[in-house]
Amino acid sequence: SRRQRQMCIRDRYNPDIMDAAKVNVLPKVEEPSVSKKEVEYATFTTPATSIPAGTIGAYTGKEIQPGFIPGYVRLGYGNYGNLDVLANYLFRLSDRDKLNVRFQMDGMDGKLTMPETDTKWNAYYYRTRANIDYIHQFNKVDFNIAANFGLSNFNLSPVQPGKQKFTSGDFHLGVKSTDENYPIQFEAETNLMMYNRQNNNTFFFNDKVGETQVHTKGLISGAISDEQSINIGLDMRNLIYNKDLKLADDLQVYENRTALALNPHYKLSSDSWNLRAGANVDISFGSGKSFRVSPDVIAQYIFSDSYVLYAQATGGKLVNDFRRLETICPYALPAGPILDTYEQLNAAIGFKASPYPGLWINLYGGYQDLKDDFFEVQEEMDYNNNPSLPDGDGQGENTPSPVTAHQYLNLEFSNTNNFYAGMKISYEYKDLIALSAAGTYRNWDAKEKYSLYMKPACEINFSADFRPITGLNINLGYDYIGRTKVEGIKAAAVSDLHAGASYNVFKGVSVYARINNILNKKYQYYLGYPTEGLNFLGGLSFSF
């Protein structure tokens, strides 16, 4: 991952655009941390060339350090109509009250070359996000209230005609205990979340559908010694849809349901050991398997201050609500009932070491088992034989001319598993240089082999950050994702060589620029959807 330094916007949303391959259910290994380091937020931007990205989480207030600069504005533009707008301001109303306001818009509008046919597509994709967050610090409890709004506007490919709009909004209330002297600690939150999809699968139905979700989370911890605690976590989602949308075979696409997750676990934190031993107990009402259990075990052994042996066995349910469907593949349409994905097991072992100051080496390997894992598939539909479409009677009469068959990108499900192994090396020298290289290999298997077509088989990442003089930051990076071969066919690998720089021209004023896909490679993050060729973005940022 790129190491980008340092902006004082204190929220938990990374302004970088996430690669599409990073937002699904690929294995997550709990990499141990020997010493805590304060999070640094980026002034350097990654342009919206791999949109869409993960949805924004609510801002959560953090302790503000002396000399903190509360305001930040960033404006950038590039070829392919790449747009980058970000504004954030943190109002310090008092020593106990803070209000954060944020607005972000990114996107693109340009001609892309379709794979296989080489035809031009006038593509556009714009995302707008607005957030407001307030936190009050009582003597022993923090109170948090927040509201978030999101809007995504984009069009579908020429072989899948149409456009789409996602509108989301949510309201958040939360409390968290802060007095560490108390033997009982707690945190709780509830979220009222709305989401609307304007258009759906035009071959089966074309109607707006709304999702209302009440998401409640809680954690209570009881200390049994200075190093040990017993904890119980709860996560409950109630999902309600405003319409009964059914496919041609009378299958319900979105089902009202309740997903309840309980997470009892024991924790030990000492100079040499970090242990977490528990279970994920998942209960479902209204859809899917009603009862599942998976482990929640993490063990880390630290020796010689900078050497760590670690192992994990984790799992749990991934609720496929509208927000997650957008991050997985916004272009895909439901071809059957939407099921929730379950990670039955993610087991890994690893070794992390720092044999030299600033140098870290991390080796790991493991196995992951997924139930009802998503995959994308293209289906060709004959426009003339669907009476539900406008101007069609199902007999080939009164149909648009010329006669066409559209390829719809659909979401389907399959049980998958993979063995994986990887290594990461990083090196930092003072505040002048930061280097990192990582590689991961995965061996996938599934009953439906074609479901693995877009799965990553090999990932390689390299990043180099330099600060040769005060105020100048230079970054060079490379991202590679090799796809899984299915029946002798393999999708083109993602190969993105990118570079960028930012320079502090005046106090509080910086100029930045970035170039992506320098090699001008053709690849896809989503099946059948091209990405931009060589592209650049530049602009100004202001802190005040």
What is the predicted role of each segment?
Residues 67, 77-81, 120-126, 163-167, ...:
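Short sequence motifs at beta-strands and strand-loop junctions characteristic
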Residues 108-115, 119-129, 143-185, 189-213:
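Flexible loop and strand-edge segments within Gram-negative outer membrane beta-barrel domains
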Residues 93, 132, 136-140, 173-181, ...:
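Outer-membrane beta-barrel proteins
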Residues 93-113, 231-240, 244, 253-284, ...:
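Surface-exposed extracellular loop regions of Gram-negative outer-membrane beta-barrel proteins
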Residues 5-9:
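Short, small-residue-biased leader/transition segments that mark boundaries at the very start
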Residues 68, 73, 274-276, 282-286, ...:
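Exposed, low-structure sequence patches enriched in small/polar residues
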